[in-house]
Amino acid sequence: MARQTDGPIAPLPSLYPAAAFQQRVLTWFDEHGRKHLPWQQNQTPYRVWVSEIMLQQTQVATVIDYFDRFMARFPTVEALAAAPLDDVLHLWTGLGYYARARNLHKAAIVVVEQYGGRFPTDSVDEMASLPGIGRSTAGAVISLATGQRAPILDGNVKRVLTRLHAVEGWPGRPAVERTLWDIAEHYTPTERAGDYTQVMMDLGATLCTRKAPACLLCPVQDWCEAHRLGRETDFPSSKPKKVAPTRHAHALMLVDPAGRVMLEQRPAEGIWGGLWSFPQCDGAADVKDWCDKWGVGDSIEYWTPFTHIFSHFRLEMTPVLIECPRALPAEAFSRPTCWRSPAALDGIGLAAPVKTLLGRLAAHLDTVG
């Protein structure tokens, strides 16, 4: 088999006149586009940026409440930069992909300290250099908040453009992505740049969906090569699949006589970075060794394992309830710890499966208490 390269896979497809394409999609936007979402009101760079980060990998319906709560707590970039990371992660609990929240906090600090609280919206490159902001997000913030021309290429836009021109290949490949950026550059207007950005995202989110696209309602249906071929759902090509490995861990639910549970803060990098979770051991033998070492093994109860699926692996977690009759020395743990009631968890960031498990633990303690 020939070795796959990242070089050009095909010449740039024949493109439609940009002005005609813009007129079609913007006419559709004027009648059907989304205009009443919370972040579309008072479109400052800060509000648009927060919404764009939240909308990565997350549905609009889910984001609305999170966005409103976030804005109520952090109404300005200065407020976000000044907040403890724990406060940010707490408000992010349930949205997943927690690196987004950590980068949001880092970027806010950079904007305040290096740019005096003003986003560098005059430069896509400068915007894209902020933590967690790539070229497409930078373009979205600039065009939506300021009206300046700045192409975008998020997942929705990739889907629209790959179908429009039947662009073969997974968009994550550099050569395919370069082709799509060239197409995006061609069609992006100078006038009504913000509306154009919004309509391209709207088309992908509401009509040109992954499954069962509503082609009959699409303003460029008669131009769409994938539709002409009857291959709409073949585009964009899927990412080459790898078998996701399974990792195993035991979650130590250490409960003291007052019914409080021990939580440990995870490292800043890696899964659930900066969030609070249970101390973990790899296997049952490690659990026993740890309990024997610290003298807390008199009452151990293994719960039914559950599986949590990450983007690149599966985590099989076995909860272990351990009665902890006395305080443990600091050296028993390698990270910051705290004792909290499982029913009173305000102010700390928790991954969704940990929050669910704490809810189960609270119910269990109520039953046996």
Where are the regions a protein language model picked out?
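Intrinsically disordered, low-complexity, charged terminal extensions of DNA damage-control enzymes
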Residues: 1-35, 40-41, 205-369
